Amino acid sequence: MLEVNILDKKWCSIIENPKNFVLGVINASLKELKIDHYKPNISIALADDDLLHQLNLKFREMDKPTNVLSFPYEQLSNECDLGDIAISIDTIKRESHEYYIPILAHIAHMLVHGLLHLLGYDHQKKDEEIIMKNLEREILASLGYNMCAI
């Protein structure tokens, strides 16, 4: 089951129906990755910089907000619990403006990025980063987004 929690009303001023948008991106990503039949449990928090700053400080010891954080469950159950994703509308807006990226494309990118982290992908090493970025590009292209600028 996919659960979307809107924790900041700014999301509703940018996307007419944030829950449907998020569910569409995540479901299409799972389909593109050919794992949609597993029906994983994922919770997505549509938040702001305040919450992402707190989470980033608590879990990564970084004293600043960030665009997206993923919290994979340590032990998967039979129901395929993948984990939680938190995403900040404030940072997304700032980065969209700074890098001239359409905001919906950037939101989709950060959702895909967070999902890939839940699935075990990482970008700490160069070879891992290449694999993850290629997957992001493929998924975003299937959604109609061009990731050239990112």
UniProtKB/Swiss-Prot annotation:
- The entry's Zn(2+)-binding residues are 113, 117, 123
User: Alphabetically, which GO biological process terms does the record hold?
Assistant: rRNA processing
Q: What stretch or stretches form a coiled coil here?
A: none
Required co-factors: Zn(2+)
Q: Does the keyword Nucleus apply?
A: no
Give the protein's recorded name.
Answer: Endoribonuclease YbeY
Which family is this protein grouped under? Belongs to the endoribonuclease YbeY family.
Where is it localised?
Cytoplasm
Question: Which major enzyme category is it?
Answer: hydrolase
Gene Ontology molecular functions = metalloendopeptidase activity; RNA endonuclease activity; zinc ion binding
By its UniProt entry, which Pfam families does this protein fall under? YbeY
Please give the superkingdom of this protein's source. Answer: Bacteria
**Cross-referenced InterPro entries, in alphabetical order?**
MetalPrtase_cat_dom_sf_prd, YbeY, YbeY_CS
Q: What is its EC number?
A: 3.1.-.-
Keyword Iron-sulfur listed: no
Assigned GO CC terms: cytoplasm
Cofactor: how and how many bound:
Binds 1 zinc ion.
Functional note = Single strand-specific metallo-endoribonuclease involved in late-stage 70S ribosome quality control and in maturation of the 3' terminus of the 16S rRNA.
Keyword line: Cytoplasm, Endonuclease, Hydrolase, Metal-binding, Nuclease, Ribosome biogenesis, rRNA processing, Zinc
Q: What is the lineage of its organism?
A: Bacteria, Pseudomonadati, Pseudomonadota, Alphaproteobacteria, Rickettsiales
